Each structure stands twice: as structure tokens, then as C-alpha cells.
Amino acid sequence: QTISDYLDNLCDRGDDISERHFRQLHLAMVDALTPNGQQRNYYLYGKYQNDGGYLCMLVAVCQESLVECKGYAKIQSYLFQLCRLYTDLQVYKHLQLNIRAKKLWQWVDKENDFALPQNVFAAATGSTLGIFMLVAYMMEDKLSEKAVSALYELYFPYVQGFHILLDYFIDQQEDLAGGDLNFCRFFANDGAFYDALYHLYWKASQLAEQVSDGAFHVMLMHAMLGLYLADPKVRSINFSDELLKKILEIGRRESQFFYQNAKIYHWLQSHLPG
């Protein structure tokens, strides 16, 4: 996750916005998912060349952890597929404005096998939740190959899309100020956003019935709804209270629980010293 955030910041705010530079940077993600893998000069095509070994250190920590992953062979192909899609998204969404949209939507049309709207599919590729969940289960080799496949199909694109649409939803004003791409801007109206979010939730809930700990994965979506919508950044977005209420109702009482507790937490953070 630290690698993901660090590379996103480099792409967002760096001086070099070439495709080959972004791809070279994201080889760190590939190497991090390869136990006993190589490390290389991830800054090869960038102006900035020296981070004091920081990125290589992060890669090494991930590689060392994955050596202990007993079920790695079963999840390797899924990890690299998710990583490839994540990398492609990061590359295309950070290109120059005059070529960004064309390359991004061409890529989406080639990869999207789920009949999802372009922006929804693109959003789903931007989450790393599937990678984390696969590794978490398979550190002790807990799942069969069939169960691994079912878990992958639950998270991509449905849980991941649900996650990132909420993330983009609360970041709209921040992204607008920074000139960053935000997939929520591509919805025609609030209703279209709600419909997309509900569809992802509905599909994921169905697929969760076919995986181990299905109720846990649904609970994660309920938690995401409550936690994201309670974020103080929501106040900066121009939308109706009715939409907020309608979105929260997707997760029913469970999301309300997380929402109310997160609101209390944020209030305490802003009012208590230290």
C-alpha cells in the first residue's frame, strides 16, 4: 500500500509525465509481488534519480513477506493480472491532458469484459484490495484453486469498483483543485452514480454467497460505505442529503453503525486536544 501511494504521488506531482517513466516506476509493483525477485532502477527514465533506496526497501519488504506465503503458486497469476491493470490505469490517467482520455478509454474498451460503464471499469482497476485479500488468505494456503478464483471474481471488478467509486466520490473537490482525473465526473448525474454503486454492491453480494467467509466480505462493503460517507471531505461536495441517505441505505443498519461511529470519531478528533 505504501508503494502504491508513493508511486501515485510521484505520478501526480512529478515533473516527468512520459508513459515509459510511469511504466518503469510501476515495475516496483511487479517486483514487490515476486518473492525472491529482482530490484531495478525504477527511476531510469525520470529526472529524479535518488530516493536514498526508499522504493527498493519497500519492494524488498514485500518480497520477503511473500516468501512466507504458502499458497503463492495458486494466486500468482491473479496478483499479476490485478497489478497489470492497476499499472495500466496509473499510466494512462496521469498522461498529458491532450492524450489522456483517448488512450484511457481505448484501453478500457479493450479490457472491459463486464459490460460496465467505462469509468466504472477503470475505477475498479484502481483498487489493490483484491491483491491484499488474496495474499491474506493464502499466507496459510487456506483456499483451493476454485475458491481462489471465486474470491478473485468477487473482488474484481465488483468490490474493487465499489471501493474506488466511494474513494473518488469523497475526493472530487480535492481532485478538481489538483487537476487530477476523477471518474465520478463522468456520471451524467447523481442518479447514475447511485445506480453504478448499487449494481456493484448487488453483484458483489451475490458472488459473496459463493466464497468462504461471504458475510465478512459483505460487511467490508457496509463498512466502506459508512467510513467514506462520514469523512469530513464529504462536506465539500455539491450533492443532496437525499443522495447521502439513499447511498447509506444500500448497507442498511450495518453501514449506519459504521457511519455514526466514524462521525463521532471525526468530531472527537477535531474537538479534543492532542
Show which residues each predicted segment covers.
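Glycine-rich, phosphate-binding/catalytic loops in enzymes
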Residues: R20-R23, L181-N182
